[in-house]
Design a protein with these regions (language model features):
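C-terminal binding/interaction regions
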Residues: 2-68, 73, 78-81, 85-95, ...
Length: 176
């Protein structure tokens, strides 16, 4: 196997033929970071979105900035941005990339909050993992901020859940 992730069929004896398509393992199956050094720099953008289901009373408290712990959305925004900036430290084999912009947008519904995180970079690899980390961490921060309001009498969270986290946009364009 060439280790270039191109799946050229030159696997060593006994190697898994499907392993030729794996870009995060070397010839012996050990984890490795993909070499992006020869790729050209491009302008890249990724957007991820997710939702946290909450009791309607909790959403109202967030909307009215009446949660005991403080401003839920401001805190979640900071958490999302911090997560974007530190993705390379938490996702194995993820490159540290120069983040040029992060936008967060919260949409409060009747029984939940949707968070959209847009990340931009100029570099050799994409930023969708950063957008996903921002969305999931931002939603986790919302949960942390409102958990006392969401707990039932047994200390459980029967109406609370994070769902539908997905990449909704991924673009790249040559630098001008």
């Amino acid at each position: 196997m060439s280790g270039d992730g191109k799946g050229d069929g030159s696997e060593p004896d006994g190697a898994d033929p499907g392993a030729a398509d794996l870009t995060h393992t070397d010839e012996s199956g050990e984890a490795q970071m993909v070499d992006v050094g020869d790729k050209p720099d491009t302008a890249r953008r990724a957007v991820a979105r997710g939702t946290i289901r909450l009791r309607s009373e909790t959403v109202d408290a967030v909307r009215d900035n009446a949660v005991d712990k403080g401003d839920v959305l401001a805190t979640a925004r900071i958490g999302a941005i911090q997560a974007v900036k530190h993705t390379w430290e938490t996702i194995p084999m993820c490159h540290q990339i120069p983040i040029t912009n992060v936008d967060t947008d919260f949409a409060l519904g009747d029984d939940g909050i949707e968070l959209t995180v847009a990340v931009e970079t100029t570099g050799k690899t994409g930023c969708e993992m950063e957008a996903l980390e921002g969305a999931t961490t931002g939603l986790n921060v919302v949960w942390d901020m409102v958990k006392s309001a969401e707990k039932d009498a047994d200390g459980d969270y029967p109406e609370t859940g994070i769902e539908s986290v997905e990449v909704v946009e991924k673009t790249k364009r040559p630098l001008e």
